[in-house]
């Protein structure tokens, strides 16, 4: 036969444990949701600022090229003066160390004296063909030059007043662009790379060996899945292969900036909090179990005493003493038993007298 204390503990303790576990679980998922939302906002803000910085960097270089182009078009220099202008830009900026160069429709390439730029067939080059399609200088798609370097070029038609069709151009190394891309990352532990959505090629990446490779040809599942989203034109923030991933279009270009951070890093702190919460929950359950046991013990002790008295009375012993101190239901019960014992004693005494 189970005692009241055992029954109460058997009912209350499991409910207490369930409540503590549920509260711990709810707290964990709320914390995880808050951290996830915060991280998404931080990654979105980071990639937006990063895109703006890259756009500003590209525009700054493009503006420099445009100034040089307009200077040549307005001054219409002779060959010697043109060389002097090109020499002034060669080595002037680390972003385009070879400065500017010009090719005409006859295949003549004009470069600065100290420039290392080489092109055996300028009129067949990417930069020349793209330059023929526009007056204002714009960036080409990425390509590999004769030196085997991955570059992009800013090119456009040069109107220097001569009867010969000319294109002016300048090269930016993709390795240099990679440095710029990764230097603007604001979120700790996040990484970024630049993609050309036309062919899925990587324009900038922390790992230089990845530059000019295609996302679809990568052995990395994450890069392949990113390539699939880029190909679909889906640039919404999402989780891809365990990475929170954000996309941003670079204004003035066709490029897509991809920034990502492993979710394991994001949830590292919340997982620690979960472990701490479980530990606190277990300690709380133990403390509550002890407190509940003590409360039940002191609450039902008068009932146990009354049970003992009633048992003695059923055995014919009316000499028992009932001590009642409380004013609750148990106290009223005790006083009733006390009155009954007193009445029975009187009846027994009258019988014997």
Predicted regions and their residues:
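Extracytoplasmic/periplasmic ligand-binding sensor regions of membrane-associated signaling proteins
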Residues: 91-96, 105, 110-184, 188, ...
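Extreme N-terminal signal-anchor transmembrane helix of membrane signaling/transducer proteins, especially
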Residues: 2-33, 37
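Amphipathic coiled-coil signaling helices used for dimeric signal transmission
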Residues: 325-353
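Extracytoplasmic/periplasmic sensory segments of membrane signal-transduction proteins
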Residues: 41-48, 53-138
């Amino acid at each position: 036969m189970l005692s009241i204390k055992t029954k109460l503990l058997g009912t209350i303790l499991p409910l207490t444990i369930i409540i503590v576990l549920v509260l711990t679980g709810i707290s964990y998922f709320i914390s995880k949701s808050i951290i996830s939302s915060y991280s998404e906002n931080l990654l979105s803000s980071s990639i937006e600022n990063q895109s703006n910085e890259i756009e500003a960097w590209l525009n700054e270089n493009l503006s420099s090229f445009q100034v040089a182009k307009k200077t040549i078009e307005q001054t219409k220099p002779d060959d010697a003066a043109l060389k002097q202008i090109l020499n002034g830009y060669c080595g002037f900026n680390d972003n385009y160390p070879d400065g500017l160069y010009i090719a005409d429709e006859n295949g003549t390439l004009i470069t600065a004296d100290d420039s290392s730029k080489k092109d055996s067939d300028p009129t067949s080059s990417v930069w020349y063909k793209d330059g023929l399609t526009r007056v204002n200088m714009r960036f080409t798609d990425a390509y590999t030059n004769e030196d085997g370097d991955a570059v992009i070029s800013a090119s456009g038609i040069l109107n220097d007043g001569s009867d010969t069709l000319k294109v002016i151009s300048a090269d930016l190394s993709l390795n240099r662009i990679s440095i710029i891309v990764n230097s603007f990352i604001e979120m700790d532990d996040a990484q970024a790379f630049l993609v050309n959505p036309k062919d899925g090629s990587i324009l900038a990446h922390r790992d230089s060996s990845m530059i000019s490779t295609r996302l679809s040809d990568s052995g990395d599942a994450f890069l392949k899945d990113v390539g699939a989203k880029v190909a679909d034109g889906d640039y919404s923030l999402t989780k891809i292969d365990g990475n929170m991933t954000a996309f941003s279009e670079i204004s003035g270009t066709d490029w897509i900036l991809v920034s990502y951070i492993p979710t394991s890093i994001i949830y590292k702190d919340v997982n620690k909090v979960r472990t701490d919460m479980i530990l606190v929950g277990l300690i709380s359950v133990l403390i509550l179990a002890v407190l509940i046991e003590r409360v039940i013990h002191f609450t039902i002790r008068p009932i146990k005493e009354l049970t003992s008295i009633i048992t003695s009375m059923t055995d014919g012993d009316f000499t028992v003493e009932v001590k009642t101190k409380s004013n609750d239901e148990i106290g009223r019960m005790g006083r009733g038993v006390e009155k009954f014992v007193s009445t029975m004693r009187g009846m027994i005494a009258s019988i014997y007298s």
